């Protein structure tokens, strides 16, 4: 007998052994079921149903948790997008503030020559346009003269005594502050009254 024929015979004998084992297992399982009483079979069926119901409840719970997590992720993403829209120009606005300050300082100087007066009026219009554009995009100017000092909005540069005003009243403003949609971009630099 060749090696190939021996191998085929061995494979067939293994297949026969496996088939016999499977058939024996099936017979013993069906025999065991037949040996169980109807009450025992009913009890086993109830146990199986209970296990399946528990599994189903667990899957439902996991599905609800996954749904809640997805909802939280969606809300967080919406909030992040909203904040990106609201505060996306913050850096740009911060960089423009010194320009606005410089224009404001230039406009404080008095001019007498007609050409200089006309130029000053043009600069005033340009400054107004710039401030209007910033306002349109959520940037608000803080000019707190006469208000109570708030360390969240103001930076105290100096304190002076003045009996005409209450303590912590803002007497003068060195540099205006700015907010972007309720968030401080730059605190106002102020002089406060301290008696």
Curated annotation (Swiss-Prot):
Keyword check for Cytoplasm, yes or no: yes
> Where would you find this protein in the cell?
Cytoplasm
Please name one Pfam family that this protein belongs to: GrpE
Keyword Disulfide bond belongs to the record:
no
One cellular component term (GO) for this entry is: cytosol
GO molecular function annotations of the record: adenyl-nucleotide exchange factor activity; protein homodimerization activity; protein-folding chaperone binding; unfolded protein binding
Q: Which UniProt keywords apply?
A: Chaperone, Cytoplasm, Stress response
What GO biological process terms are annotated to this protein in UniProt? protein folding
| Entries under InterPro entries matching the protein | GrpE, GrpE_coiled_coil, GrpE_head
- Record Gene3D superfamilies: 3.90.20.20, Head domain of nucleotide exchange factor GrpE
| Role | Participates actively in the response to hyperosmotic and heat shock by preventing the aggregation of stress-denatured proteins, in association with DnaK and GrpE. It is the nucleotide exchange factor for DnaK and may function as a thermosensor. Unfolded proteins bind initially to DnaJ; upon interaction with the DnaJ-bound protein, DnaK hydrolyzes its bound ATP, resulting in the formation of a stable complex. GrpE releases ADP from DnaK; ATP binding to DnaK triggers the release of the substrate protein, thus completing the reaction cycle.
Subunit annotation: Homodimer.
| Stated family | Belongs to the GrpE family.
- The name this protein carries in UniProt is Protein GrpE
Q: Species name for this entry?
A: Francisella tularensis subsp. mediasiatica (strain FSC147)
This protein's encoding gene? grpE
């Amino acid at each position: 007998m060749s090696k190939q024929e021996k191998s085929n015979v061995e494979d067939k004998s293994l297949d026969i052994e496996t088939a016999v084992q499977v058939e024996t297992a099936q017979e013993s399982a069906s025999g065991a079921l037949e040996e169980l009483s109807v009450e025992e079979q009913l009890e086993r069926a109830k146990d199986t149903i209970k296990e399946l119901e528990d599994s189903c409840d667990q899957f439902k719970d996991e599905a609800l948790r996954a749904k809640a997590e997805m909802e939280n992720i969606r809300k967080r993403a919406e909030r992040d997008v909203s904040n990106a829209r609201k505060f996306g120009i913050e850096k740009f606005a911060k960089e423009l503030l010194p320009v606005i300050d410089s224009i404001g300082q230039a406009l404080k100087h008095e001019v007498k020559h007609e050409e200089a007066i006309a130029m000053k009026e043009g600069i005033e219009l340009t400054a107004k346009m710039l401030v209007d554009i910033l306002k349109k995009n959520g940037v608000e100017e803080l000019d707190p003269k006469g208000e109570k000092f708030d360390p969240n909005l103001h930076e105290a540069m100096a304190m002076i005594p003045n009996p005409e005003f209450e303590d912590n009243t803002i007497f003068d403003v060195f540099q205006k502050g700015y907010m972007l949609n309720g968030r401080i971009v730059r605190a106002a630099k102020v002089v406060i009254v301290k008696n």
